[in-house]
């Protein structure tokens, strides 16, 4: 097994937070070179925008102490949560080796959780630190297993992290709050124990007017401010400055600072309005206050959107939706406003009390890409087989000579060039593409031969070249049966 160099130390704490120890944090380290998962408890130390951890181990190997500095601090949440992240790969020397590291973590309610992702010589290690660190980059309660009372005076259940009209605000909240929209569902779930059932309702307005109301839930807070259904005063809002708490003691917003490429969600839908047959799922990534339907005042805060407003019943069977995010800019998000409704049109719910619109929702997942989209050395395209490629160049290569692109919107790309020990004119470029949630990485290697040092000529990109590949003095690849002077691993031999 390769010698393991690992680091865990990164970010945390803003200039407003004092140096803090977080003791007895659970930790699990996994690697792409072994199926073993090393579990232990550890202490992390946070001082302003520096994160450090001591005494790391993997497979009974001491990994030492690590520290990362100059971390990005994301704050401004009314509940005091602090999020810390590397904005790009940081390069650290561990055991004499250059290591590429990425980190993301948060301090919330005096508890720490985070993910450290590092690569050394093509080997990738991921340390999950703290309770539910693997849920970073996902919405809370994404499987809809946990519910709470909407309020002290209501027995209506809301999924943890989600909110219905029972907790709405606005001038008409008294009327809208009579709607029963969300229910625990244990029989019709897609997986696990529960899912959520969202159902439309018919409200009594002024005691005698019957008004159909869409069944709606949101990660923000619903507002009822107009009798005109499509008025933007009727909306879902995400406001990080709002101090109100829901029935579970959580704010009316989710903390979400990553950049997913798509969102998948399982739904089972039945609409009962012929002219308005579609349900909708809409997600907005933002770094400040936003609402849905959007208002011009807040559009500048939008970073990305993911929308499906054409959800069909499809025989009332479970279906998986895959909704891509479209990014408007490169800003860092602070939260995600997700709104799910039984009808894509405001105020177009079923007027039949016996046939209300209903959508079951389960298993929401954020998808993060980390595949290689393209790779070039100057103007030469690189072709990879089994994540390896080989090129021959004139002179020594530089990391800046290589252009790497990923299919991940927020994927982190690191490049580490290393001279091969004992091999004249040979070096290896280690490329790592890490998903924005830091939970998966793809590692690539480029074997580089400096032909001016070895006598090899003719630049080419060869995805099949290995350490045993033979060349003649013209730089042509030859077989073992070739007679004459050959070059192997940068050294010349006479093959008889």
For each feature predicted by the language model, list its residue ranges.
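Aromatic (Trp/Tyr/Phe) and Gly/Pro-enriched flexible surface segments
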Residues: 127-260, 277-287, 291-322, 326-327, ...
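Beta-rich interaction/scaffold domains
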Residues: 369-453
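Residue-level detector of functionally pivotal "anchor" positions at catalytic/ligand-binding pockets or at interdomain
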Residues: 369-374, 449-474
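Extended, low-complexity, turn-rich repeat/linker tracts enriched in Gly/Pro/Ser/Thr and Asp/Glu
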Residues: 59-61, 269-277, 289-292
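Beta-sheet ligand-binding and adhesion/scaffold domains
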Residues: 79-135, 218-234
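Central antiparallel beta-sheet cores of small beta-barrel/beta-sandwich binding domains
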Residues: 36-98
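Bacterial Sec-dependent N-terminal signal peptides
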Residues: 1-24
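Edge beta-strand at a domain terminus
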Residues: 19-31, 38-41, 63-77, 111-139, ...
